[in-house]
């Protein structure tokens, strides 16, 4: 769950490290829906994501905030403002990242996804 989440977050993150949760959620759902549409495994057999549950944005949002987001929040890499509907990257971490760093992170996530599903 971490790789699709991170890719979605990075794609929607603005210059101050914020991303609207609804935008991240849309891409996160689209990743798994695309796998279902192509007849590919979504994840492990115990994964709750299927054609029906992916239509329930509230459930998927809750799932996404529990795992994988919570893992990043626990390490204080990210935080979520429910009132603003925004997921934010820790500003100290953001300040250390260059555009090249973000490209390397995205490339690594894509490579890891390929390996994960092999």
Model regions and ranges:
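Intrinsically disordered, charged low-complexity linkers and terminal tails
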Residues: 1-118
């Amino acid at each position: 769950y971490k790789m699709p989440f991170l890719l979605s977050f990075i794609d929607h993150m603005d210059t101050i490290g914020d991303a609207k949760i609804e935008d991240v959620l849309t891409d996160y759902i689209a990743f798994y829906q695309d796998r279902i549409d192509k007849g590919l495994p979504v994840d492990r057999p115990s994964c709750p994501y299927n054609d029906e549950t992916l239509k329930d944005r509230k459930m998927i949002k809750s799932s996404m905030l529990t795992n994988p987001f919570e893992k990043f929040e626990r390490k204080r890499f990210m935080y979520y403002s429910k009132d603003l509907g925004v997921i934010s990257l820790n500003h100290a971490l953001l300040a250390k990242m260059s555009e090249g760093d973000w490209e390397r992170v995205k490339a690594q996530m894509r490579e890891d996804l390929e390996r994960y599903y092999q």
